[in-house]
Amino acid sequence: MALAAGGAPVAALDLDGASAEETANLITKAGGKAKAFQGDTSKAADVDRAVSGAVAALGPLEIMVNNAGILDGYFNVDEIDEALWRRVIDIDLTGVFLGSKRALADMLPRGRGRIVNMASVAGLNGTGGGAAYVAAKHGVVGLTRQMAVVYSSRGVTINAVCPGPILTDLRRHSQAILGPGVPDMSGRGIAVSDEQVRSVVPAGRRGTVEDIASAVCYLASEEAGYVTGHTMVVDGGWRAK
């Protein structure tokens, strides 16, 4: 929505097709251009179909935001099974690889583009999630930096946003995607309660989706043309402590 408010046409790819349609409808009702696609970001065919459809409907791909992600139930290595490990890695890391690879296929021939990957403060330390989530987000940070080194000279900037505690439905959405084999995540993790947030976040509150959207919009803008390979931490000062 924030990118659309700035004048960008937006294509939304979501496993929940209704959610993608809702986003596209909100944008078009506000006077913007949008297209919705249902698909799995961890499957190359779905990503290719969505990007190809978006380019056909909306024009050249200028910005790719790899935002899909799920939690892992906060399982440690001795608790998580291989199936859950692979599913989390597929969505949280392989999805970023696939989205970036498909975006580069359009951006590199034109010599311009912006890729913004959603990482996490869990990708910068050993807390903030279970084993699979922390490993995947570290992978996103590393992949972002490697791609920036390789492709920035060809006109494509590549950065990551690392949110701290944010007011979202990520726990509930993760639960719905992963199914009943994952424990209730509503009370698990760091900074679950308001009291915990105040104790670990100097700003004294959770962040909002608008806080994250502002960071994404900056990294996607012309003003950020010399910013690449950067991990922008948006955590209310959590990691500064």
Name what the model sees in each region.
Residues 120:
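Residue(s) in the substrate-gating loop at a strand-loop-helix junction
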